[in-house]
Amino acid sequence: MQVIETLAEGLKREIKVVIPAKDMEDKMNERLADVKDKIRINGFRPGKVPAAHLKKVYGKSIMADLVNEIVREQPAAILSSRGEKSATQPEIAMTEDKDEADKILTAQQDFEFTLSYEVLPPIELKSVKGIKVTREVIDISDDEVNEQVLKVAESARSYESKTGKAANGDRITMDYVGKVDDEAFEGGTDQGAELVIGSGRFIPGFEDQLVGVKAGEEKTITVTFPADYPAKNLAGKEATFDVTVKDVAAPGAVEINDELASKLGIESADRLKEIVRGQIESQYGSLTRQKLKRQILDQLDEMYKFDTPASLVDAEYNGIWSQVNNDLAQSGKTFEDEDTTEEKAREEYKTLAERRVRLGLVLSEIGEKAGVEVTEDEMQRAIYDQLRQYPGQEKQILEFFRSQPGAAASIRAPIFEEKVIDHLLTEIDVTDKKVTKEELLAEDEGEAKAETKKAAPKKKAAAKSEAAEAGEGEEAAPKKKAAPKKKASEDSAE
């Protein structure tokens, strides 16, 4: 077998592989010799079929098997012998001419194919001893815990029907039909909808007009959808809602006690506070971790500068760009609405994709040298977390992970990355710094920079509680950002 390098340009490689027809024929004859005693052909005793006849009957199929085996096995062997790792699966090209293919299968012509791929760049690891990061630490006060417990209690509070007029804080149960230009619009109708006046869950002006209504009353409410409303067919338009009030209920007293805890399925009020404190600690811990990780990645990004495989960058960029456009479409916005242009956005995301690929390669090399591995238990837990997001589809999801190596890799990658970060935290200089809640939540200069690369958040449309599917109201005004938070985040190298 001849292996000839025909292209070595940057990270691109092209290898021509030639297996002489004589070698292919010899391998075919070996296969025929191995199976001749097992083959049954009418008119011949077992093991007595002439070799020429066997070759005539089975030669092409055996040669086809040999070709498939070579194409399947040799690329990895060739890369290994060259001491190279390909960035993606090598592309394999061979003749598509039927006459040439027939000559190869009959050992009249050498079998040739070409491998095209990009190599992973060699990375010479540098010492991380000079990396210095600050870990922000926050003390959680009893007041903050009590404040959150109170919110939990308010969400679980009971309401009691009343005969008087509705006031701020009362819960209204109602049917309504929304209309624009006297025509009911999709998603603007509901029955038995519940709304706490003053909760801000409906579009501006809607809830205020419910103050003073009574059970059994019918009322027409007039509102104007915000100009930046996600549903463009409703944005800026005046709408009316014909409301029938079914019930007005006053909120019960909020008491944090064992009875409340029991209602929530918790043994005691003290245990409820412990759980809430743990949740707050987890939330702050995640934010601290995110800031810490950003500092590490930023410094690694400064330390390593090398060419990245275009195939990996393109794949990363395409993923980011797809999510950017999906998020913009769902928010009903354009690049101009986000104070940028498509051309500028593409440049930013291309740079971001290159950074993420470069950091991913660096972290991979660091992890490999440090012996970082993702255990089977860690994979199982991560897959279980995925299954919980799709109740009733567990069997299909499991089969998907079993049959698609790429799916398992997408689960493994973030786990591996976090374990490498854990390893780095044992090697670098970490200084703890006590901060306030406001300081922890504040963006530093680096975060503010990255924030400009995140897309407008998805905006729930609601003229009814929790958002009407067709987008007839809003829960919160979106912040102006230019890229999706998850995919465009610089806090990850995945």
Swiss-Prot record:
Nuclease keyword on record: no
Entry keyword annotation includes Cell division: yes
Gene3D superfamilies, sorted: 3.10.50.40, Trigger factor ribosome-binding domain, Trigger factor, C-terminal domain
Substrates-to-products reaction catalysed: [protein]-peptidylproline (omega=180) = [protein]-peptidylproline (omega=0)
Subcellular localization, as worded in the UniProt entry: Cytoplasm
Residue ranges constituting the PPIase FKBP-type domain according to the UniProt record: 169-254
Family: Belongs to the FKBP-type PPIase family. Tig subfamily.
Function comment: Involved in protein export. Acts as a chaperone by maintaining the newly synthesized protein in an open conformation. Functions as a peptidyl-prolyl cis-trans isomerase.
This protein's name: Trigger factor
